Amino acid sequence: KQKYFEKFLDGRTIREAILSEEEKNMQETTEDDELRIVNSVETEKELKEKIKTLPVDKVPIIIAGGSFNTKGRETIPSEDGLKVLKDFIQNIDTEKVYFVIGHKMQGYEKAVIDISKELDKKVEIDAIVPKLVTEKVKDRLLDEKVKGICISPETEELGIYKSFNYEIFERRKAVVIAFDGNSPVLNLVQEAKNGKGKSKIYVNQENELLKEKADTLEGYVVPFEMKDNIVDKIIEDNPEI
């Protein structure tokens, strides 16, 4: 196993190797774009009943962990991670906040919907989605618990983080909890940090890339581990939620 690992690294650091693999995946995604577009539907046409403007009188809480992966990577929520999310959802004031997730309806983002149903928590859940989605994603977005969608001008799903910036981070304060992802989630965190709204950002440092991002943005983000009592910290930092 050590031999195979050393061969994989080929003189690179673990970080360099991971980023190199991501770059390959992103190139494959670009090459597959034409095929993906052929097999996609227009979001505005197929989901017109769901289109809405994001609320301005509530605090947006962005949960990242499912939609922010390059091709070939999937987010599998951990038991501890789901406990954190459940505890958080139990403690928020649904009159003061709403959730914003990505378009894939997977991982921790899907768990927001499932846990809200389980707890019968009447919280608004919206999604920011690209101009084109697959039939499978369209069907997931039709879930009755997703109140509305905001359509990004981006055709490519890896670029939707730009719309999170324009629609949320540049306009208002938000709370960002990044559970998982790779390069797209790093872009999201960076946009949240740069935005005029001065968002509060919490990142799961059990994810190696998010840990490195937290080190880079030390003082601007709060790193946590799934077994930490991070929910109390988030509530304490953001009494308005």
Q: Language model features by range: what are they?
A:
Residues L9-R12, D33:
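Intrinsically disordered, low-complexity regions enriched in serine, threonine, proline
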Residues L217-I241:
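C-terminal functional extensions of proteins
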Residues Q2-L9:
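Extreme N-terminal basic, low-complexity initiation segments
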Residues T13, A17-I18:
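Short, positively charged and aromatic/hydrophobic N-terminal segments
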Residues E21-E22:
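Amphipathic alpha-helical oligomerization/scaffolding segments
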Residues E34-K50, L54-D57, A64-M226:
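Acidic/glycine-enriched connector segments
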